[in-house]
Amino acid sequence: MSAKWEKKGTNDGELTFEIDLPQIQQGLDQAFQRVRKNLTVPGFRKGKVSRTVFKRMYGDAALYEDALNILLPDAYEAAVKESGIDPVDQPQINVDSMDEGKPWVIKATVTVKPEVTLGQYKGLEVPKQNVEVSAKDIDAELEKRREQQAELVVKDDKAAENGDTVVIDYVGTIDGTEFDGGSSKNYSLELGSNSFIPGFEEQLVGHKSGDEVTVNVTFPEDYKAADLAGKAAEFKTTIHEVKVKELPALDDDFAKDLDDDVDTLDELKAKIKKELTDQREEAAKNAVQEAAIKEATDNATIKEVPNAMIEQEVHNQMDQYLGNMQRQGISPKMYYQLTGTSEDDLHKQFEADAATRVRTNLVLEAIVKAEDIQPTEDQVNEEVKNLASEYNMDEKAVRKALSEDMLKHDIGVKQAIDIITDSAKEVESAKDDADKEASDAKADK
């Protein structure tokens, strides 16, 4: 095969290639076998006409279109490989010549991946992450866990405050008419939780059990039920009970009740400190990685990202997101109904930073090439094993879903990320230095 690539624009060009005579003959033979099945010729049973008779009656030209459709995919793929280009979209095919007895000449207009000129990607300076866990942090976590273990106790004759839970009946009306979803009985509502329409909870503060309260509110303009959005409503509300949170005492008994692995409050604090430290170290690692990758991407030069790549990235993200929803038993249709959104809304959501994601991927791929990263078969096997475990799939199913090239691509990108991240240097920002000096000065007084 003879293939020639001629660049026409930043990311576009023309790929000219030939389909040689032996290939053409094979294509014509296959096309004939397809056509003859439904062909009726006088003197022959349906589908039984010979190749010689067909050629005499219709000529090979009658098979050219079918033969080209048969041959084109493999011929184009071979031409792409020979020319070394990396297409990102379906080509526009134009037949240059299909003369009898000569190779067919095909011209394809192709959009390819843009060229990436790497800047610095090793030894990048990124903001230092604070992973220190203070006594204040531990106390805040303890308080959160006390809140989770709190009991709601009924308090007669107590005026409701934010943080209290009221048990209520309510009937909502708009212009004197009840509406769907506007009524409930024995509903438990935590005041200050902002779980009801803005203004509703505030009007129950200060009232006691047995009180009947008329609550007047206006539905937000962006309320998910469009028929209620922006409308004024009145809720006849009866308070049955006012409940107050009673927090458990912060002592050894609380610690043992909360965690079977500890016997004292001090042991619980030590365990919480380790948990918070582990969380912050993981978050710090992710933050360093994100900052280093962003800087490496910013340091690189890419003239223009093809729209086809951006659109493909959007669809990939949508497919992945909706696929995760389906694994949780939520179909795309159900998801759109539950969220009050549409496919267009989801498309816009992922479109917002699609170009940035594409640029990042291009830079990482360029680093893979620059570092001559070539994943081994053992690494591929390990990747398959990890994916099978993560998605609860059989390893054979993973290999069927992902080609060897795709697996090696993903492994290579991960190794490129490690190169960027492992060589990055964490440095104190000017603000961090100033804060530290102020803290040290305060401690010296």
From Swiss-Prot:
Belongs to the FKBP-type PPIase family. Tig subfamily. It comes from Lacticaseibacillus paracasei (strain ATCC 334 / BCRC 17002 / CCUG 31169 / CIP 107868 / KCTC 3260 / NRRL B-441). Residues 163-248 form the PPIase FKBP-type domain. Its EC number is 5.2.1.8. GO terms for cellular component: cytoplasm. The lineage of its organism: Bacteria, Bacillati, Bacillota, Bacilli, Lactobacillales. Involved in protein export. Acts as a chaperone by maintaining the newly synthesized protein in an open conformation. Functions as a peptidyl-prolyl cis-trans isomerase. Residues 425-445 are annotated as: Disordered. GO terms for molecular function: peptidyl-prolyl cis-trans isomerase activity; protein folding chaperone; ribosome binding. This is Trigger factor. Coiled coil: none annotated. One of its GO terms (biological process) is protein transport. Keywords: Cell cycle, Cell division, Chaperone, Cytoplasm, Isomerase, Rotamase. The gene is tig. It is an enzyme of class 5 (isomerase). It is found in: Cytoplasm. Pfam families: FKBP_C, Trigger_C, Trigger_N. Transmembrane segments: none annotated. PROSITE patterns: FKBP_PPIASE. Consists of 3 domains; the N-terminus binds the ribosome, the middle domain has PPIase activity, while the C-terminus has intrinsic chaperone activity on its own. It catalyses: [protein]-peptidylproline (omega=180) = [protein]-peptidylproline (omega=0). Signal peptide: none annotated.
